[in-house]
Amino acid sequence: GPNTTINLACASATAAFGVAEDWLDADRVDRVVIISGDDVTGDDLWEWIAGGFAASGAAATNNVVEETALPFDRRRNGLILGMGAAAFVIERHSEAKQRGVQPIAEVLGSTTANSAYHGTRLDVEHVGQVVNGFITNMERRWGLDRHAMAPNTVFFSHETYTPARGGSAQSEVKALRDTFGDSTNKLVVANTKGFTGHPMAVGIEDASMLYGLKTCLLYTSDAADDLGR
């Protein structure tokens, strides 16, 4: 069957779900195995990757981890690099049934976008447009209502303790408010980076999301004592 390598920086593992969806919809495959891994803290990559983040001003400046891993916190001052690996199996219902496997979740849709805006900053307006467009498409496709599903929705945040302007925190909060309006405060926002650091392309958030669906347990950060923007 087909195989490929996805390189969308720290969105690579998540983007692979979209490729899997396309392959299944096109009847190219019946099952896709996604394997993701990154070891940027290892001896081979550390000087290059850490040096790049430090040069761009994105690396944390505080050497006390508990005071640094602060997603959405007003005190955040940069990210901590992490490492890890994850694997996922995406297959047709018939294949899972044949194997006697109970699926954890169903993929209803995906989207991928690139604003070509900046290497280390986000186009805040474009992020909001993409999220709103995706939710609108899912509403039409599956007969959903964003306000009805908001109280039962968990948003897994990518926020990596970025700067107050032009970073993940500002982009994500604005995108959610533009998309869900008055229902935004009914959403649960989960973020794993207070525990894992930023493991680049690994997809720890995807694995944590699926584990949360299976166990009804969510890992939220303790570092929101002084919420910023």
List where the protein language model places each region.
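Active-site histidine-anchored catalytic micro-motif
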Residues: 16-17
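Short, high-confidence coil segments that cap the C-terminus of an alpha-helix
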Residues: 28-30
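Short, solvent-exposed loop/turn and secondary-structure capping segments
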Residues: 44-47
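Short conserved active-site loop signatures built around small residues
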Residues: 13
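Short beta-strand segments
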Residues: 7, 32-38, 108
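Short beta-strand-to-turn element immediately C-terminal to the catalytic PLP-Schiff-base lysine
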Residues: 90-92
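Conserved "HGTGT" condensation-loop signature of ketosynthase/thiolase-family condensing enzymes
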Residues: 1, 22-25, 41, 52-80, ...
